[in-house]
Regions:
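Short glycine-/small-residue-rich Rossmann-like dinucleotide-binding loops
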Residues: 79-81
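NAD(P)+-binding Rossmann beta1-loop-alpha1 motif at the extreme N-terminus of oxidoreductases
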Residues: 1-76, 91-104
């Protein structure tokens, strides 16, 4: 079921802070990182310290991450430029539809 307003890929410092900012402004947000342990750590930190943690949902599977976002999907990429960005887009594409948006 698609319940999240927006998705964010990349949970380094900028990704974490942007995800929290979006959640703090009342939007539901799905988060994904290619290293599942990074997502797990971020979600555990949020549950313990962030009032808006209920608007954040972490995913270890990129397909489930995409499915959780309302159509047309809006996905923000905050990953290293170059090969990492290309690999992330390649992993997302099989799960996206024509009207979905990737913001890089």
């Amino acid at each position: 079921m698609s319940t999240n307003d927006i998705g964010l890929v990349g949970l380094a410092v900028m990704g974490q802070n942007l995800a929290l900012n979006i959640a703090d402004h009342g939007y539901t947000i799905a988060v994904y990182n290619r290293s599942p342990e990074k997502t797990t750590e971020f979600m555990a930190h949020c549950a313990a310290h962030e009032p808006a943690h209920e608007r954040l949902t972490g995913f270890a599977d990129i397909g489930e991450f995409v499915k959780s976002i309302k159509r047309p999907r809006k996905i923000i990429l905050l990953v290293k430029a170059g090969a990492a960005t290309d690999a992330t887009i390649a992993a997302l594409l099989p799960h996206l539809e024509a009207d979905d948006i990737i913001i890089d």
